[in-house]
């Protein structure tokens, strides 16, 4: 079976950026996901648990790394080493990560290290409109109402 890796600098980024697309592919690919950081759990919920619940909707394997948000630049080499070793073990066909046009500092670091480690895979960047000053796309993937409903269910897992 072919493999997809979806990477979230923060626990809700996958759902927002490519949740419907991953739902579309859930029966065709093994989907692995990585949550790199999370905000501290708030009184209304636990973002790490919410991430696991959301990813269960697309039957994804989940890894949470537990890095601190907004200082990923201090962990660049660790991230690169982690991604490099993961790529050697798994040889993913498609990688979803933040777009190269994303201006959030954590998203930029993740994109850059993903690009270095997985340069022989297809890398598709997802966009979060509030982080991008421009909209530039090379790939559109059609999703249906069922995929969109699944994305909404994934987002509904979050109380935080």
Kindly give the residue locations of the regions a language model identified.
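Active-site rim/loop-helix segments in enzyme catalytic domains that contact anionic ligands
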Residues: 1-91, 115-120, 146
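The feature marks non-catalytic terminal segments
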Residues: 2, 57-60, 90, 94, ...
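Short beta->alpha junction loops/turns
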Residues: 10-11, 100-103, 144
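Short aromatic-enriched loop/helix-cap "lid" or pocket-rim segments at secondary-structure transitions
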Residues: 18-19, 44-47, 108, 134-139
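Short, flexible active-site-adjacent loop segments at beta-strand->alpha-helix junctions, enriched
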Residues: 37, 68, 100-101, 129-132, ...
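Conserved short-loop catalytic and cofactor-binding motifs
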Residues: 39, 70-71, 98-102, 139
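Active-site adenylate/phosphate-handling loop in enzymes that bind or generate adenylated species
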Residues: 83-132
């Amino acid at each position: 079976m072919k493999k997809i890796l979806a990477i979230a600098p923060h626990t809700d980024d996958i759902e927002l950026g490519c949740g419907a697309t991953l739902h579309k592919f859930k029966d065709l690919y093994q989907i692995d996901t990585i949550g790199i950081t999370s905000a501290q759990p708030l009184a209304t919920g636990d973002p790490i648990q919410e991430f696991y619940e959301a990813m269960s909707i697309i039957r994804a394997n989940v890894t949470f790394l537990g890095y601190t948000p907004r200082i990923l630049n201090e962990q660049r080499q660790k991230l690169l080493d982690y991604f490099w070793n993961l790529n050697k073990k798994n040889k993913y066909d498609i990688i979803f990560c933040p777009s190269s046009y994303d201006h959030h500092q954590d998203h930029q670091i993740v994109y850059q290290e993903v690009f270095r480690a997985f340069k022989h895979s297809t890398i598709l960047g997802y966009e979060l409109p509030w982080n991008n000053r421009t909209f530039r796309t090379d790939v559109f993937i059609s999703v249906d109402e069922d995929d969109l409903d699944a994305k909404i269910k994934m987002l509904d897992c979050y109380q935080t």
